């Protein structure tokens, strides 16, 4: 099974100079990021709903990556097709940037974790500097809940059929980490950077 659009070529990322991060780590100038991911309560006296299992990825800040992410978000407003392509494109761009960091030998600067049952997360031992936090939370939704007109379906993955959808909430934050400090971040559904609907597809049966 594949996410529609995920197979398309991601927008190339521009490698980030990691020398400052390595120097900070070598000198012991490290800090961290903690936070909580949750849905805000819509009723008085009703507790917030933690989004356990949300994925949190922290990467060295790249102005190039931020610009490209914002461009995908802006383009998503152009049409229904662009909106459906946005979620897979955002994920593909993040993964391409992770791979560039790994390939450059900076695998230790790619940090990831998941939110616990209460929605809390912690990313420790980050060298002091500017970082980019990208968090995602996916919920499987009914196959027909987000379906468009038949002519709009399957435009990204020929010879496949739709098996379902994921509603993906995405948070994008720029964080400055300082020595000996832990930056606290609350990520709520209302404060999400982008909400995507990602198609799940499987290959058509061969005849």
Each model region followed by its residue ranges:
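Long luminal/extracellular ectodomains of secretory-pathway precursor proteins
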Residues: 9-207
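Bacterial N-terminal signal peptides
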Residues: 1-5
């Amino acid at each position: 099974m594949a996410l529609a659009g995920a197979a398309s070529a991601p927008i190339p990322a521009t490698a980030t100079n990691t020398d400052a991060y390595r120097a900070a780590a070598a000198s012991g100038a490290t800090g961290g990021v903690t936070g909580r991911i949750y849905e805000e309560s819509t009723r008085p006296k009703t507790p917030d709903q933690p989004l356990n299992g949300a994925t949190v990825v922290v990467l060295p800040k790249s102005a190039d990556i931020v610009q490209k992410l914002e461009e995908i978000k802006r383009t998503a407003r152009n049409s229904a097709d662009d909106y459906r392509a946005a979620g897979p494109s955002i994920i593909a761009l993040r993964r391409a940037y992770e791979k560039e960091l790994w390939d450059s030998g900076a695998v230790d600067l790619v940090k990831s974790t998941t939110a616990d049952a209460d929605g809390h997360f912690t990313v420790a031992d980050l060298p002091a500097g500017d970082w980019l936090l990208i968090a995602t939370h996916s919920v499987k939704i009914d196959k027909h809940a987000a379906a468009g007109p038949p002519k709009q379906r399957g435009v990204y993955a020929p010879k496949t059929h739709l098996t379902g959808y994921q509603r993906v909430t995405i948070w994008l934050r720029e964080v400055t980490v300082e020595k000996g400090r832990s930056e606290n971040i609350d990520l709520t559904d209302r404060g999400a950077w982008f909400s995507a609907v990602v198609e799940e597809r499987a290959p058509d049966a061969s005849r």
